[in-house]
């Protein structure tokens, strides 16, 4: 049988299931969560409300939202032994590696951590893990740098609480809003490498923690979540606005990838990037913003005709840099938001579960004869 027509490397444009959670219009550059445009949600909603929307398929009432926020707030703290583990980790541990280790440990001390995934279990544990990720990320950075552990404050929003724990003081309102918007924009993006990893593990009816750890491992990759760190390093490498054009054409000549440009689904400007750019213009370093803006013009002029345009990673790092967030934490912020989408897709998929089991097209030899080792050369 000739299977060539069934081969889709990278699973590009392969649909493995149906979903009510997210829709991407890659041609027009549109993104919807449960039918709501991401632009409207970023402007009017909050991360907590968006998590509720993604998980339960509707915008909450006032009482539903308040109860959900209370559940998140009371789940933010970390057990003493978790803090001790963070203190024992090697100081050169990548923040995503630290996050992976701590969440794995939380699964080990959760009495129901090994229960096979069901939608009910997914959301119950999801509240706890979603609430704890900012505490883990902020305090891992503090501990590794010899600073004191800062416990979370229940009165603060999810976004403000992260910045408070990281910096040791409550953030300005404009920082809180920018971080809240960032988490909304990172919350969900249909199926991608990390979401597929979560769904694949979940499809085996493993536990919630194992599924989420698979997503964290995938997101750590430099061409997935890690690209946000590489994009801002790229602007720093260029150094000044006057050097952008020379750098760009040299990069093209060397067939070097422009970090923050190009996307498997979007063939036009990423709608999330437009929103991040607005906040980068307000909060970002002025010189780096000018470098990025000049490089953006060249990307749009020379690469957009090939379907390569600006993606979410391009501007987001400038927003974080403007809030004095260390570059090494940028990918963990991605995870801080994307836990919402991972959890939603995990619950949706296991509600009608079928184990994910694709095929590989074999191109090797068959019928080879075994040769005893003494006769081999």
Swiss-Prot record:
It comes from the Archaea. The keyword Transferase applies. Keywords: Allosteric enzyme, Transferase, Tricarboxylic acid cycle. The active site is at 263, 313. Pfam families: Citrate_synt (PF00285). Its EC number is 2.3.3.16. One of its GO terms (biological process) is tricarboxylic acid cycle. The keyword Transferase applies. GO terms for molecular function: citrate (Si)-synthase activity. Pathway: Carbohydrate metabolism; tricarboxylic acid cycle; isocitrate from oxaloacetate: step 1/2. InterPro entries: 2-MeCitrate/Citrate_synth_II (IPR011278), Citrate_synth-like_lrg_a-sub (IPR016142), Citrate_synth-like_sm_a-sub (IPR016143), Citrate_synthase (IPR002020), Citrate_synthase_AS (IPR019810), Citrate_synthase_bac-typ (IPR024176), Citrate_synthase_sf (IPR036969). Homodimer. This is Citrate synthase. The gene is gltA.
